[in-house]
Amino acid sequence: MASRILGSIKEEVTCPICLELLTEPLSLDCGHSFCQACITANHKESMLHQGERSCPLCRLPYQSENLRPNRHLASIVERLREVMLRPEERQNVDHCARHGEKLLLFCEQDGNIICWLCERSQEHRGHNTFLVEEVAQKYREKLQVALETMRQKQQDAEKLEADVRQEQASWKIQIQNDKTNIMAEFKQLRDILDCEESNELQNLEKEEKNILKRLVQSENDMVLQTQSVRVLISDLERRLQGSVVELLQDVDGVIKRIEKVTLQKPKTFLNEKRRVFRAPDLKRMLQVLKELTEVQRYWAHVTLVPSHPSYTIISEDGRQVRYQKPIRHLLVKVQYFYGVLGSPSITSGKHYWEVDVSNKRAWTLGVCVSLKCTANQSVSGTENYQPKNGYWVIGLRNAGNYRAFQSSFEFRDFLAGSRLTLSPPLIVPLFMTICPNRVGVFLDYEARTISFFNVTSNGFLIYKFSDCHFSYPVFPYFNPMTCELPMTLCSPRS
């Protein structure tokens, strides 16, 4: 009887999760109690799969702040442990709860230990029974194998749990990165729209100032015209009210002046053609922005390499070049055209860099094979700027003429030994709605293309060289021309 009561109490204070006696028991709002460690682990699992905390038994939701220590249960568990460790209670465990006899037999059919009276009862009649000592080793081995199996499964379960947690952390990082990228992309779009709005409003303000200025001038003209008419009216009234002499004095001149009076109508602007505002092509802008973002993934770290002799000054960090007026004694023999190369050389892959050309009146940039002796005093520098001579460049002249330089005839591999032909290049005019302060250069060596982007104008394509012949390593090329303002290599975050 005592064992049965003890077993009943044990059931009441057993954790439904780990099936062991409660350790640091916590009670939920629904009244069920669990080990602190068990309910904490269950809380994490519930939030992961269900998005809310719920009781493992009745599934009623609960709040973590409502978990409360159950000291009464903890006290019962503590006393139960003491009772279970007493020798007399241990002895009761070894005896049959029904008959009080010692448990010496094992029933194979029921898989349980029984006493000799149980064996003779109707319940176990015909069952195979053995002495506990005879089957103990057999089942000890089975349980040992089961223990090893469960330990391995525990390791596998822990690994699966760790894998899930790692995947969860990885997904959180990935989602956070995607959120950051999305926010950055839309911020960039908002910045573009804000810039477009600002430009449109500035243009409208300029138009308003211009029209109002002309209308004010027109108003002044109308005021003068009205005053002139009033003077004539006043003269006529004076003559009509005066004597005959005053009436006829220079009457022909007065009549002629009156006949010549022609009212000038004020200038109006209602019929003039005004620039109609059109919302920007967002689809096109997004496509262009996507293309620019794609090539910017291949941002290369380029530094400028001094060439001697050269009419340029390079900054200490190798990121800026400016024109320097030549020293007199170097004017006699010039073996190199003004310009510098970027490092490292390019022999494969995709490469992108950006150049700040703000406020410069002239510049040239792009890609070239090398600074060979491609210029001298008697040859204009632009004649070298041809793909057949190893230059794929665009440039600005006279603060407004943008151009690309193509070969004047079919390409010949000048590095293979053919003589340089110094005929003028084919000039391709480039039209810019927004003048570029930053120019992006993208080189795809395998695709044999070089593209130039107007970063200032949301990354619109300026020009593209196709079917380029790269027989040898190529280099980024920079020429500040005779404008003393610098050309500066930009960093990805600038």
UniProtKB/Swiss-Prot annotation:
Keywords: Acetylation, Antiviral defense, Autophagy, Coiled coil, Cytoplasm, Immunity, Innate immunity, Metal-binding, Nucleus, Transferase, Ubl conjugation, Ubl conjugation pathway, Zinc, Zinc-finger
Zn-finger segments (B box-type): 91-132
GO cellular component assignments: nucleus; P-body
Catalytic reaction(s) noted: S-ubiquitinyl-[E2 ubiquitin-conjugating enzyme]-L-cysteine + [acceptor protein]-L-lysine = [E2 ubiquitin-conjugating enzyme]-L-cysteine + N(6)-ubiquitinyl-[acceptor protein]-L-lysine
Primary enzyme class: transferase
Record-listed N-acetylalanine modification sites: A2
SMART domains, sorted: BBOX (SM00336), RING (SM00184), SPRY (SM00449)
Modifications the protein undergoes after translation, according to the UniProt entry: Degraded in a proteasome-independent fashion in the absence of viral infection but in a proteasome-dependent fashion following exposure to restriction sensitive virus.
Coiled-coil region(s): 132-223
RING-type Zn finger ranges: 15-59
Protein residues bound to Zn(2+): C96, H99, C118, H124
EC numbers, comma separated: 2.3.2.27
Single GO biological process annotation from the record: positive regulation of canonical NF-kappaB signal transduction
Subcellular compartments: Cytoplasm; Nucleus
Keyword Transmembrane: no
GO molecular function, one term: pattern recognition receptor activity
Pathway(s) of this molecule: Protein modification; protein ubiquitination
Domain named B30.2/SPRY: residues: 280-494
Free-text comment on this protein's domains from its UniProt entry: The B box-type zinc finger domain and the coiled-coil domain contribute to the higher and low order multimerization respectively which is essential for restriction activity. The coiled coil domain is important for higher order multimerization by promoting the initial dimerization. The B30.2/SPRY domain acts as a capsid recognition domain. Polymorphisms in this domain explain the observed species-specific differences among orthologs.
Functional note: Capsid-specific restriction factor that prevents infection from non-host-adapted retroviruses. Blocks viral replication early in the life cycle, after viral entry but before reverse transcription. In addition to acting as a capsid-specific restriction factor, also acts as a pattern recognition receptor that activates innate immune signaling in response to the retroviral capsid lattice.
Oligomeric and partner information: Can form homodimers and homotrimers. In addition to lower-order dimerization, also exhibits a higher-order multimerization and both low- and high-order multimerizations are essential for its restriction activity. Interacts with BTBD1 and BTBD2. Interacts with PSMC4, PSMC5, PSMD7 and HSPA8/HSC70. Interacts (via B30.2/SPRY domain) with HSPA1A/B. Interacts with PSMC2, MAP3K7/TAK1, TAB2 and TAB3. Interacts with SQSTM1. Interacts with TRIM6 and TRIM34. Interacts with ULK1 (phosphorylated form), GABARAP, GABARAPL1, GABARAPL2, MAP1LC3A, MAP1LC3C and BECN1.
Protein name: Tripartite motif-containing protein 5
Name of the gene encoding the protein in the UniProt record: TRIM5
